[in-house]
From Swiss-Prot:
Taxonomic superkingdom: Bacteria
Record text on subunit structure and interactions: Homodimer.
This protein's pathway: Amino-acid biosynthesis; L-tryptophan biosynthesis; L-tryptophan from chorismate: step 2/5
Gene3D superfamilies: Nucleoside phosphorylase/phosphoribosyltransferase catalytic domain (3.40.1030.10), Transferase, Pyrimidine Nucleoside Phosphorylase, Chain C (1.20.970.10)
UniProt protein name: Anthranilate phosphoribosyltransferase
Length: 344
């Protein structure tokens, strides 16, 4: 299928099958399609609404163009689509560090800030991590520590061919959905936060086509009417759980896990330096209850999808114990010591 045929089909409201979408996205990644046609394609997809087969095909194409690090041990990722407008601190990044302290292997995929003041790369860099490690050094570090950050521009170099169009458009497009689906390590266990309740089931169907093992795709809401691409300690969380090919959808509340309900204002973040300080406060056991609850909620889910614990509740308890025993801070300090000694 040519880009011209795809555009005409989209104008008629047609859905691209996954192979057609994969072909078009591959041409985009290869720099073979003009910026104006890329823009038209993205806008028409957005206007009609992206479908499961299209998201799957696009993700396949991008992964096929990515540099894939070989990371053994079935690592997990905690990642969100962004776009919730909540401006919280980096909850999923903090949770990934605490889950690692619990014994979970982590391949955290991320980038600098796009829709918020501080992206996962920004806050980790502010904490002292080297974020832009090449493939070889990433693989070696993972063997030693079981925790790595996969900086998107390093592993997805072909994305540079669409970056100017995305920036100039200034609209949410299919690429805003794809970030959590294109971890270059091809993680099979994930916590994915999405900006729309409708996306939880769609993402589960996409991940099932990728033969993912155990994933929680979730959308949080607040009692004040806001939304979160995180599990919510401020209201309900809608979850589509994919486990060994089966999807079930349900709703949970903080109280289901012994957590208090908090105001979203208590989770607000700032720039990279401020968010790094917030994470250190949590690790030092000086974080306000709301912040600690938000982090252990996600970390507990990470323990659950990694099958380190048989339930989310037990994962939450394990994550909180890691903080209160000092094990989480010690784990992060050991990681930072490794990063300080890296020679690239």
């Amino acid at each position: 299928m040519t880009i011209e045929e795809a555009l005409l089909g989209l104008l008629d409201g047609q859905t691209l099958i996954s192979s057609e979408m994969e072909s078009i996205m591959s041409e985009i990644m290869d720099g073979q399609i003009s910026p104006i046609k890329i823009a038209a394609f993205l806008v028409l997809l957005r206007q009609r609404g992206e479908e499961v087969e299209e998201i799957y095909g696009a993700a396949r194409a991008i992964l096929n163009h990515a540099e894939q690090p070989i990371l053994e041990g079935d690592p997990i990722d905690t990642c969100g689509t962004g776009g919730d407008g909540a401006n919280t601190f980096n909850i999923s990044t903090a949770a990934s560090l605490i889950a690692h302290a619990c014994g979970v292997k982590v391949a955290k995929h991320g980038n600098r800030s796009i829709s918020s003041r501080c992206g996962s790369a920004d806050v980790l860099e502010a904490m002292g991590f080297k974020i832009d490690l090449p493939k070889k050094e990433t693989e070696e570090l993972f063997k030693e520590t079981g925790f790595v950050f996969l900086f998107a521009p390093i592993f997805h170099k072909a994305m540079k061919n669409v970056a100017p169009v995305r920036k100039e458009l200034g609209l949410r497009t299919i690429f805003n959905m794809l970030g959590p689906l294109i971890n270059p390590a091809r993680t099979q266990r994930q916590i994915i936060g999405v900006y729309s309740k409708d996306l939880t089931g769609m993402f589960a169907q996409v991940l099932r086509q990728f033969d993912a093992k155990h994933c929680l795709i979730l959308h949080g809401q607040t009692d004040e009417g806001g939304i979160l691409d995180e599990p919510s300690v401020c209201g309900p969380t809608y979850i589509s759980e994919l486990q060994h090919g089966t999807v079930r959808t349900y709703t949970v509340h903080p109280e289901d896990f012994g957590l208090r309900r908090h105001s979203i204002s208590q989770l607000k973040g700032g720039d990279a330096r401020e968010n790094a300080q917030i994470i250190w406060q949590i690790l030092d056991k000086n974080g306000p209850e709301a912040r600690e609850d938000a982090v252990v909620f996600t970390a507990g889910m990470a323990c659950y999808v990694a099958e380190l614990t048989p339930s989310i509740k037990e994962g939450i308890d394990k994550a909180r114990q890691a903080i209160h025993s000092g094990a989480a801070k010690q784990s992060v300090e050991r990681l930072l010591e490794k990063h300080r000694n890296l020679v690239i």
